[in-house]
């Protein structure tokens, strides 16, 4: 009984952790996209002020050149985060499925559970340790 309760709590924790990770990725994506947009607006203002849009021109504004590099770096980071989002979303779905299975097992009363009490105790200790 105790190990099943702990297993259920563990599965809840795993779902919460995966949800937090996915939310963090989404938050970072939104922030990076906002920053890239702001920098692009500043680049446009600098180019308009200088009247030069050719990056290779000798009089191209230094700030605009540096901001353009920063936008490229942000776009690379955005692409990396998008690549990380799909596996994080998949991990969340898997954790939710495991939680659902554990809840169903708990609802059935754990029938068919013929584990050795010594093994259950070891599993419980490992869950407590980490």
Residue ranges and their predicted role:
Residues 1-130:
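Charge-rich amphipathic alpha-helical interaction elements
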């Amino acid at each position: 009984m105790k190990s099943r309760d702990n297993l259920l709590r563990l599965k809840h924790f795993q779902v919460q952790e995966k949800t937090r990770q996915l939310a963090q990725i989404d938050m970072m994506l939104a922030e990076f996209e906002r920053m890239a947009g702001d920098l692009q607006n500043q680049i446009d203002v600098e180019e308009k002020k200088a009247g030069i849009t050719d990056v290779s021109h000798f009089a191209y504004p230094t700030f605009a050149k540096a901001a353009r590099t920063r936008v490229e770096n942000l776009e690379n980071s955005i692409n990396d985060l998008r690549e990380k989002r799909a596996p994080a979303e998949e991990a969340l779905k898997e954790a939710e499925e495991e939680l659902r299975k554990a809840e169903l097992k708990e609802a059935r009363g754990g029938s068919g559970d013929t584990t050795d009490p010594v093994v259950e105790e070891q599993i419980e200790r490992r869950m407590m340790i980490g």
